[in-house]
């Protein structure tokens, strides 16, 4: 209870860094890009919170980091996605779902943001035009689109179960003691922006490459994302990895 004559405590809310006094928002100018590139060439990447002040930019650290990572890095490719890259995106999406960071980690020079935008504006529509479900990568069955339940023998009806995000978000590797609490979520966070550092593990990388490079129809030879991945071949390598390689920044 609040004592007599006492003041109600004022709750402090954290405000986004871009709303601080004097911080610029909106599109970056050519001059700002040049300042950021010049500073990073001299001082290197990192320490993003203090970088704007050290570089003389009226931007927040997050804005500087995203501008560098998605646009200004020398290794970043912009536009002109090739047919080979498009085919690889389709294969990886069928295997990994909407895990754009993981997908970008397998396509040199492409950012997760660009791949996500290209998927939503081009590839998703392309699959729909071909009669392919962009989520499951299976043919759309026009006969079952409006059927809420499926008839089975004996007249009994069972509802069709929708594809749950748990099929794609929680692929785990058991630590060996049978305790699910010790399982590792090898695909990271729940928002689709995972750390893909573990992909550099040799065994897992070889395992993933063997699936990606499967020869044949890109819609027919890769494990559907509704089925759990069989991770036995690379389990030891992932479980043995350090916690730093599996964690998030």
Swiss-Prot record:
Identify the keywords attached in UniProt to this record, alphabetized.
Activator, DNA-binding, Nucleus, Repeat, Repressor, Transcription, Transcription regulation
Subcellular location per the Swiss-Prot or TrEMBL entry: Nucleus
Q: How does it assemble?
A: Interacts with BHLH002/EGL3/MYC146, BHLH012/MYC1 and BHLH042/TT8.
Which segments constitute the HTH myb-type domain?
Answer: 20-72, 73-127
Protein name (database record): Transcription repressor MYB5
Predominant location of this chain? nucleus
Q: Which GO terms describe its cellular component?
A: nucleus
Q: Name one GO molecular function term.
A: DNA binding
Q: Which stretches of sequence are listed as region Disordered? A: 133-180
* Keyword hit for Chloroplast: no
GO biological process, any: mucilage biosynthetic process involved in seed coat development
Give the Gene3D superfamilies listed for this entry. Homeodomain-like (1.10.10.60)
- Organism encoding this protein: Arabidopsis thaliana (Mouse-ear cress)
Q: In which tissues is it expressed?
A: Siliques.
Statement: the UniProt record of this protein carries the keyword Transcription: yes
- Alphabetical list of CDD domains matching this protein: SANT (cd00167)
Q: Function of this protein? A: Transcription activator, when associated with BHLH002/EGL3/MYC146, BHLH012/MYC1 or BHLH042/TT8.
Please list the residue ranges the record marks as binding DNA.
48-72, 100-123
């Amino acid at each position: 209870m609040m004592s007599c004559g006492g003041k109600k405590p004022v709750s402090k809310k954290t405000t986004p860094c871009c709303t601080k006094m004097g911080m610029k928002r909106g599109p970056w100018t050519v001059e700002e890009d040049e300042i950021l590139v010049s500073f990073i060439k001299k001082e290197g990447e990192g320490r993003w919170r203090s970088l704007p002040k050290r570089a003389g930019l009226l931007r927040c650290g997050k804005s500087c980091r995203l501008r560098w990572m998605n646009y200004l890095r020398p290794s970043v490719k912009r536009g002109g996605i090739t047919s080979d890259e498009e085919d690889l995106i389709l294969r990886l999406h069928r295997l990994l779902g909407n895990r754009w960071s993981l997908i970008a980690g397998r396509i040199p020079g492409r950012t997760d943001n660009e791949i996500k935008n290209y998927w939503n504006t081009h590839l998703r529509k392309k699959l729909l035009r071909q009669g392919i479900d962009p989520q499951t990568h299976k043919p759309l069955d026009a006969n079952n689109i409006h059927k809420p339940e499926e008839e089975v023998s004996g007249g009994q009806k069972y509802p069709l179960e929708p594809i749950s995000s748990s099929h794609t978000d929680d692929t785990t590797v058991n630590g060996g003691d049978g305790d699910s609490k010790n399982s590792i979520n090898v695909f990271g966070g729940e928002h689709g922006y995972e750390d893909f550092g573990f992909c550099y593990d040799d065994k897992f990388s070889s395992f993933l490459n063997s699936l990606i490079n499967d020869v044949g129809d890109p819609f027919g030879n890769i494990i559907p994302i509704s089925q759990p991945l069989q991770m036995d071949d690379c389990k030891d390598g992932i479980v043995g990895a350090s916690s730093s390689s599996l964690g998030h920044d």
